[in-house]
Each structure stands twice: as C-alpha cells, then as structure tokens.
A protein has these predicted regions:
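The beta1-alpha1 cofactor-binding region of Rossmann-like NAD(H)/NADP(H)-dependent oxidoreductases
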Residues: 1-8, 41
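Residue(s) in the substrate-gating loop at a strand-loop-helix junction
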Residues: 80
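SDR active-site lid
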Residues: 113-186
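Alpha-helical segment proximal to the catalytic Tyr-Lys
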Residues: 64, 109-112
Length: 208
C-alpha cells in the first residue's frame, strides 16, 4: 500500500532481470469484519489502502516499464469470488475486491493495443494466512470496532473454510493454465458456477 515501496520493488526487479514482463498484484487483508454500524473509517482505510491501492500502485509503477521494452507483458490482479458476489459482514473486503475486478476490466481495454494482457484471479477459499493479517495491521489503521456474537461465529466459520480450502499450488497451476490460454477471468472453484449463474440470471432479468 506504499507507492515508494513499489518503486523499490521495481528497481530491484530491473537490477536482477533487466526487464519486467509480468506483475502479479496479490494483496489481501480482511479489514473490519462485522455489521455496517460497527465498521469505522480506519478499518475501511486499511482495506482500501492494501486491497485496492496496492494494486493501483503496482500497475502504475510496472506498466510503464513493460511498455518501455515493447515486448508485451501481463498484469495479473488477485481479486476474490467475494468481489463477484459479496457476503455478509465483509463490506470492506468485498467492496475492495469488486473494485479490483472492475479495474482489471478497465485496464484490459486500455492496455490491449499496447500488447499488455490483463487477467483477474477470483478464487474462493484457499489455504492462505489471511486471518493472520490482523496482527500485522499498522497502528494508524487500528480501529475500535466491537465484535458481535454473530460476527464472531461468522469469523470462525470463514476461518474454517479457509483452513479447509484448496492448496495454493493448485491456484498457481490454474493461473499458469489460464495465462497460456489467454483467459481474462480466472476462476478456481467450479462449484461456485451455479451461484454465479443465479446472480447473472437476476441481472439479465432486471433488463427485461
């Protein structure tokens, strides 16, 4: 979530590899979890700065470096199934991941004629350490949000689903496969397809 740090990463990558052809914007914190009225500005700002602005800075810094050599490249933004269809108590997380999906769609159209492909990865539950992100929350983002009993139950259930999710290596292989096939949307959990079909059907019906 720091533009200067992204510039340092770019400098290190150029020093090591000479050119940059691909960037994977992978950042995710849960933000405050709970009812709308319990989520304060600091929790929202944390999610916005990491989940959204981290992606923005990554593309802003790296895209000119990919354009510079004229050989084309790829930007992969990591969103979430939550960014396609939000769940309860996860307002900040779902909003920022939805923004990543929308940004990816925008950038894909913008960069296509520059030879730069854009893809957006939307996984569901994966065995990551996202629930440990709270301990790394900087002091300036510490909030006073109170946890409700319902929220605590929801948090515990989502942690269990993360712990029982697919392995990261499976996601990695899926991404490689998708890039080889030139896919824009990258999904890792086929069992969510019916949920997406239902959502899309509701949207289609609203246009009638």
């Amino acid at each position: 979530a720091d533009e200067a740090q992204w510039q340092e990463v770019a400098n290190q990558a150029l020093a090591r590899f000479g050119k940059i052809h691909m960037v994977v914007n992978n950042a995710g914190v849960g933000g405050d979890i709970g009812p709308i009225e319990n989520q304060d500005k600091k929790g929202w700002q944390w999610a916005l700065d990491v989940n959204l602005m981290g992606v923005v800075y990554g593309a802003k810094i790296m895209t000119p470096l990919i354009k510079e050599h004229g050989e084309g490249g790829w930007i992969v933004n990591v969103a979430s199934m939550a960014g396609i269809g939000g769940g309860p108590y996860l307002g900040a997380y779902t909003a920022t991941k939805a923004a990543v999906v929308a940004l990816s769609e925008s950038w894909a159209g913008e960069l296509e004629d520059k030879g730069i492909h854009v893809s957006v990865l939307c996984p569901a539950f994966v065995q990551t350490r996202i629930h440990e992100s709270e301990r790394n929350r900087p002091a300036k983002y510490k909030s006073g949000s109170a946890h409700t009993p319902d929220e605590g139950s929801f948090t515990n259930s989502t942690k269990q689903m993360v712990d029982n999710g697919i392995e990261v290596s499976i996601v990695g292989r899926r991404v490689v496969e998708a890039l080889e096939d030139g896919e824009f949307y990258i999904f890792t959990h086929p069992n969510y397809h019916p949920v997406m079909q239902e959502r899309n059907a509701a949207i289609d019906a609203a246009f009638i």
